[in-house]
């Protein structure tokens, strides 16, 4: 599992006040962390577990106590969890088209992360986009 927000550095002028403290120097919050699967987990389950069990690459004081912060809400209409923020970086924090997206093995699934069942060996990346995914390689 990898969590990255390096696109923010290309759009730093749009970043909301007070959010600079949560940006890792490298732009990477978690770097290729392995998560043990028992079978049937979703991409959401994996990211949640990775955040609970690890600290960020900067080993910041915010993560030392409880792991990497992650906030999400359940959306009944889509029967899915929506990731609002990771490491205190939330959707719309870097412009109106910013937020979190995920890819599995380099592809962006057409379904929410809690609907996508992962397999052992999958490479899961949660990336912060500042431009509806175009800046991270997701072109509709």
What residues fall within each predicted segment?
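Ubiquitin-like/PB1-type beta-grasp interaction modules and other compact soluble beta-rich domains
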Residues: 1-140
């Amino acid at each position: 599992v990898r969590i990255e927000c390096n696109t923010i550095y290309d759009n730093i002028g749009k970043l909301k006040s007070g959010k600079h403290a949560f940006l890792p120097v490298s732009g990477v919050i978690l770097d290729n962390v392995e998560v043990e699967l028992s079978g049937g987990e979703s991409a959401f389950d994996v990211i949640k577990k990775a955040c609970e069990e690890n600290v960020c690459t900067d080993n910041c004081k915010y993560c030392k106590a409880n792991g990497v912060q992650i906030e999400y809400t359940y959306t009944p209409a889509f029967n899915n969890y929506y990731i609002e923020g990771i490491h205190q970086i939330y959707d719309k924090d870097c412009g109106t088209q910013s937020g979190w997206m995920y890819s599995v093995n380099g592809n962006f699934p057409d379904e929410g992360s809690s609907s996508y069942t992962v397999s052992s060996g999958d490479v899961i990346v949660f990336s912060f986009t500042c431009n509806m995914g175009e800046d991270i390689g997701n072109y509709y």
